[in-house]
Amino acid sequence: MKLTSFCLFLFLAFSINSFSQSTASPNVTTFELEAPQLDTIKKIWVYLPESYKTSENKYPVIYMHDAQNLFDRETSYVGEWKVDESLDSIGKPEAIIVGIEHGGAKRIDELTPFPHEKYGGGKADDYLEFIVQNLKPYIDSNYRSLPDYSNTGIFGSSLGGLVSFYAAFKYPETFGMIGSYSPSFWFNRDIYKLPKNEKLNPETKFYFLVGTKESEEMVPDLREMIEVLKKNGLSSENFKAKYVEGGEHNEALWSDNFLVTYFWLLKK
């Protein structure tokens, strides 16, 4: 797949809403929070575990990108991840899921650490600063969260997979669990310098997933990155890479594998 058509797919898939009925669980609520770093107001989706209402338990928190596609078919373009239905069905382990809506036309800017010579972007530092300095303190103050590094994750797909990977190096004492699906490492190859130039917390857990029928760069790019990580000290115990035969770049791939990743990241 050529990069031009690939980027067009990304833009359309995350910028157009469908008109189907809402499928969001009753355990999902939303609120808005100012994001001064991005000069906008962000809509935030929060999934609370079933036991939240009847206990005083505290829970791990996973921050996820592209909230429009996580919980509700009505707000997604080509299908949802069904995060809420999946977690409602399993019981334990339980976690709070915080979804951050993407910025529409600004999505590329927000989710890319380095600019592309053609597609621009490169403002992920501002986006992550909003999560760490504004959103996370709000969540930790208003919900019964476990705020420490080992109980805080960040998770996304495509450009969301890229920025989740980047967050592990930008905030190595904040995010202990990284879910990186179909990461867009092709966007700027400076991302491969990151493990060499930035210190990684050795306890950080990474779960990577790609499909063999995504863009032609996806599988070799991930394999290259894993070799870079290994050379720079990442323990084999702290990462998992799954290559899905026939998997395509879409919500079906990511939804089908979400629970497996969730279990692995939360396993103590």
Residue ranges of model-derived segments:
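Bacterial Sec-dependent N-terminal signal peptides
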Residues: M1-S25
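Non-catalytic cap/lid and distal C-terminal segments of serine-dependent acyl enzymes
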Residues: Q21-K268
